[in-house]
């Protein structure tokens, strides 16, 4: 029974991932996806049965658009998630950490050489992304040239501020001729457009969260915070708070609340907070899986609740010959998805 459930969850979650990453049309809310993902992960740990295409082993989804493909020499992976501050504190292990905004947008990589932006790409499945260099001139805050001649590779999030999305959402349509229901889909559809004209005027912005290559001339090259601060000389504006080594629950909550307030004041779309080690050498020693790096955690906010009406229970036979109850309730919109 557990193996059958694992196979069903993998199939279901991969369908959801394809719709989310390649079609910009999520089929379920983030909360529902996370619930199913956690169930799959727990079953895999209990049984030791893990399929090669399990979402727990990979990140994102292989891009299938007509955009040119870009290979990432350094994989752009995700982070493990938690909803408990106590798990953040246990994870620190006496190390200094950064608290950063977890923006709800599209992970993007920028490459500069000889002071010029030469390539921009999406994360894709972490190994292969899409070339979106042609759309970068439409971004509002990405410099095309910088006073830095060495190679520089930075990753961050492409997004549309919440106030701009509210202003624009009723004036534009997605590929199916329907209004965009959430800012993440709007940003993704804009950034991944084949025609740069579709990205112009959509208020797309970029916020860096990591330096993958370069910036070795900063005072403390092993410090993630120091490298991020160095990006301010090139016009970027990262937001983070750095902790000491003995962080209490009260201070962790304070860091998180300050960042949440900053996001609200600046209309930044967020779905959590990232906690990651400041020391780059220590981060590297933590290792990784096929899905996530082990040098940080993504703190997810508590799920929102929505009211609807349960109309009836239907008993439906499955393809395995079992009879399963199905609750029929009124459609409710969650995270821009019509859930029924």
Task: Please tell me what each predicted stretch does.
Residues 1-146, 166, 185, 191, ...:
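Phosphate/adenylate-binding "loop-and-lid" substructures adjacent to NTP/NAD/dNTP-binding pockets
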Residues 73-76, 96, 117, 151-153, ...:
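A residue-level signal for beta-strand positions that form part of recognition/binding surfaces
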Residues 86-89, 162-340:
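Long, charge-dense accessory insertions within large macromolecular proteins
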Residues 97-99, 154-156, 270, 310-313:
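Two-metal-ion RNase H-like nuclease active-site motif
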Residues 111, 122-123, 157, 170, ...:
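Surface loops and adjacent helix of pleckstrin homology
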Residues 144-148, 199-200:
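Arginine/glycine-rich "motif VI" loop of SF2 helicases in the C-terminal RecA-like domain
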Residues 148-161:
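Long, non-coiled-coil amphipathic alpha-helical linker/lever segments
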């Amino acid at each position: 029974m557990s193996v059958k459930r694992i196979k069903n969850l993998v199939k279901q979650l991969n369908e959801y991932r394809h719709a989310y990453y390649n079609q910009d049309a999520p089929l379920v809310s983030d909360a529902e996806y996370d619930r199913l993902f956690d169930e799959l992960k727990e079953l895999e740990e209990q049984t030791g049965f893990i399929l090669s295409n399990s979402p727990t082993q990979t990140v994102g989804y292989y891009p299938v658009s007509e955009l040119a493909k870009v290979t990432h020499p350094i994989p752009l992976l995700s982070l493990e998630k938690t909803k408990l501050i106590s798990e953040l504190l246990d994870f620190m292990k006496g190390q200094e950490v950064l608290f950063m905004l977890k923006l709800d947008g599209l992970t993007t990589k920028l490459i500069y050489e000889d002071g010029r932006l030469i390539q921009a790409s999406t994360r894709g499945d972490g190994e292969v992304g899409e070339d979106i260099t042609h759309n970068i001139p439409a971004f509002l805050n990405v410099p095309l040239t910088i006073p830095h001649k060495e190679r520089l590779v930075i990753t961050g999030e492409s997004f549309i501020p919440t106030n701009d999305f509210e202003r624009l959402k009723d004036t534009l349509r997605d590929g199916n001729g329907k209004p965009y229901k959430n800012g993440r889909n709007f940003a993704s559809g804009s950034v991944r457009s084949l025609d740069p004209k579709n990205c112009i005027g959509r208020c797309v912005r970029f916020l860096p969260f990591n330096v993958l290559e370069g910036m070795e001339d900063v005072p403390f090259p092993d410090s993630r915070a120091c490298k991020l601060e160095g990006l301010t000389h090139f016009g970027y504006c990262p937001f983070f708070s750095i902790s000491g080594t003995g962080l209490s629950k009260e201070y962790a909550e304070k860091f998180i609340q300050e960042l949440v307030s900053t996001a609200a004041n600046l209309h930044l779309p967020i779905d959590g907070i990232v906690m990651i080690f400041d020391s780059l050498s220590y981060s590297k020693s933590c290792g990784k899986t096929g899905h996530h790096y082990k040098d940080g955690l993504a703190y997810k906010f508590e799920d929102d609740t929505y009211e609807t009406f349960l109309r009836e229970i239907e008993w439906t036979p499955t393809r395995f010959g079992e009879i399963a109850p199905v609750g029929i309730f009124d459609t409710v919109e969650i995270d821009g998805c019509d859930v029924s």
